[in-house]
């Protein structure tokens, strides 16, 4: 929810994220794992069931997890895996790929094709790049240049584009939450029953009340009952990752590959921890971004649908 700026000054009116510019604004100003920490708090508040392999869900019926396998534990897990994912992706950025930001590539296109004050410079860019729909759309703006329009006033970050920090953290945190909670649990009933923690008034998230100032219409899709914990966590991860592209600072593959890098970081972290719990048996499962069932148990990772990925985790 953001202030609605009028004349550069914030006003009391607030609104939900509603378009690509709003989403780009969020991923420019957020704390990196903010969306998933908030999601964890909501899942805990809504009483989302734990994964069936959590001992406190299936075995210890008269106890609840706390410091281990409980609420405080998952909150620290989300924070810890975010840090680990960042370290992994920063190595890829600086020591492996060093990929140009889209903004910088637009600058190369400008200097090769149009130049500056009549002076051009050859960078070896192929002719077809200038004939793409995207290049023509950018050139067709009033400025008439190939400089990329940016949603971020500060422009692109000065570190390389591939992989994407936001996407790696998104993949890691979403995977941690999908493994921790029952990811195929339907969400509609829990969302409809949600109340504000202070006022206890209904939040009306799924079917907001129609008011003159409400810019979010009621959801009319027939698939409302099919929304699940895992599906909504995937949606958050995708929105945050792609929101950086909407800001103009990433290529699509920066995000799609880094989501999977984060997924692997989280899975390896769970694998290493799974041998240390006193509570037995311990097993966590989730659906990967590719729709594969992944199970972590006793220091091993099983991926029946992808033997190569299972072999990777066995290293």
What name fits each language-model region?
Residues 1-315:
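Hydrophobic alpha-helical bundle signature of multipass membrane enzymes
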């Amino acid at each position: 929810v953001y202030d609605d700026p009028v004349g550069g000054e914030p006003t009391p009116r607030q609104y939900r994220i509603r378009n690509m510019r709003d989403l780009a604004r969020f991923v420019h100003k957020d704390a990196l794992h903010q969306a998933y920490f908030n999601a964890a708090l909501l899942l805990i508040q809504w009483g989302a069931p734990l994964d069936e392999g959590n001992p406190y869900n299936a075995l210890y019926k008269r106890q609840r997890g706390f410091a281990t396998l409980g609420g405080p534990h998952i909150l620290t897990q989300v924070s810890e895996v975010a840090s680990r994912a960042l370290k992994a992706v920063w190595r890829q950025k600086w020591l492996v790929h060093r990929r140009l930001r889209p903004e910088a590539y637009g600058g190369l296109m400008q200097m090769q094709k149009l130049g500056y004050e009549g002076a051009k410079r050859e960078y070896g860019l192929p002719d077809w790049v200038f004939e793409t729909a995207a290049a023509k759309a950018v050139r067709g703006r009033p400025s008439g240049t190939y400089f990329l329009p940016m949603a971020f006033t500060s422009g692109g970050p000065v570190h390389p584009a591939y992989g994407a920090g936001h996407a790696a953290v998104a993949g890691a945190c979403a995977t941690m939450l999908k493994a921790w909670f029952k990811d195929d649990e339907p969400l509609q009933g829990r969302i409809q029953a949600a109340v504000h923690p202070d006022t206890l008034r209904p939040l009306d998230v799924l079917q907001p009340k129609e008011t003159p100032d409400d810019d979010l219409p009621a959801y009319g899709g027939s698939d409302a009952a099919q929304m699940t914990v895992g599906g909504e966590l995937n949606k958050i991860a995708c929105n945050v990752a792609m929101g950086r592209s909407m800001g103009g600072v990433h290529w699509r593959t920066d995000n799609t590959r880094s989501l999977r890098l984060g997924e692997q970081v989280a899975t390896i972290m769970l694998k290493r921890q799974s041998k240390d719990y006193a509570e037995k048996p311990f097993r966590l499962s989730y659906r990967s971004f590719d729709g594969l069932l992944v199970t972590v148990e006793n220091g091993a990772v099983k991926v029946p649908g992808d033997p190569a990925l299972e072999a990777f985790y066995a290293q």
